[in-house]
Swiss-Prot record:
Keyword annotations of the record: Ribonucleoprotein, Ribosomal protein, RNA-binding, rRNA-binding
Subunit (UniProt): Part of the 50S ribosomal subunit.
Name of the featured protein: Large ribosomal subunit protein uL15
Region (Disordered): 1-57
SUPFAM superfamilies, per database record: Ribosomal proteins L15p and L18e
Record-linked InterPro entries: Ribosomal_uL15, Ribosomal_uL15/eL18, Ribosomal_uL15/eL18_sf, Ribosomal_uL15_bac-type, Ribosomal_uL15_CS
UniProt xrefs under Gene3D superfamilies: 3.100.10.10
Family assignment from sequence similarity: Belongs to the universal ribosomal protein uL15 family.
GO biological process annotation, one example: translation
Superkingdom, natural source: Bacteria
Segments of skewed composition (Basic and acidic residues): 1-13
Residue spans of biased composition, Gly residues class: 23-35, 42-52
Biological role: Binds to the 23S rRNA.
Length: 147
C-alpha cells in the first residue's frame, strides 16, 4: 500500500446533489421546490413558530414571572474546585480569576459545598458562602470571611 493508491471506503463519500442543473438530474428546473408559492421564492418561508395564522403556541401560553433588574448573579465555586489551590492559600475573587477557576466574577463569588475539600487551612474571602461549605472549610482548618 502506498499513498497514491489509497482510496476512501465504498459508500463513505456521497456525491453532493446539485440542484437546478438540468431536468434529467431529477432536481432541475424548479430545484425540488415545487411550482409557485411562498416556499418556492428566494428567501421565502415562514418564521419559526408560525402556525398559518392560528395563534402560536407560545402566545396561547400564559406569561410567567419577571426579570429582576436588581438581581445579583454570583460566580459559583464548589469545594472540590478549591482543591486546585495550595494548602494555606487565600481564596478571593482575584485569586480565583488568576488561577483560571472563575472567568467572570459578576456580582461576586459564592462557595457551595459540592464535593470534598482536601486542601487545608484555606482563608476564604468571598461575597457569599453556603452554611455547609463554611462548616467544611472550618473543619479543614480554614477560616471564612464574607464580604
Amino acid at each position: 500500500m502506498e499513498l497514491h493508491s489509497l482510496k476512501a471506503a465504498e459508500g463513505s463519500r456521497k456525491v453532493r446533489n446539485r440542484v437546478g442543473r438540468g431536468t434529467s438530474s431529477g432536481n432541475g428546473k424548479t430545484s425540488g421546490r415545487g411550482q409557485k408559492g411562498q416556499k418556492s421564492r428566494s428567501g421565502g418561508g415562514v418564521r419559526p413558530g408560525f402556525e398559518g395564522g392560528q395563534t402560536e403556541l407560545f402566545r396561547r401560553m400564559p406569561k410567567r414571572g419577571f426579570l429582576n433588574v436588581n438581581r445579583k448573579e454570583y460566580a459559583i465555586v464548589n469545594l472540590e474546585t478549591l482543591n486546585r489551590l495550595e494548602d494555606g492559600a487565600t481564596v478571593s475573587a482575584e485569586t480565583l480569576v488568576a488561577a483560571k477557576i472563575v472567568k467572570d466574577v459578576k456580582s461576586g463569588v459564592k462557595v457551595l459545598a459540592n464535593g470534598e475539600l482536601t486542601a487545608k487551612n484555606l482563608t476564604v474571602k468571598v461575597a457569599k458562602v453556603s452554611a455547609a461549605a463554611k462548616a467544611a472549610i472550618e473543619a479543614a482548618g480554614g477560616s471564612v470571611e464574607e464580604a
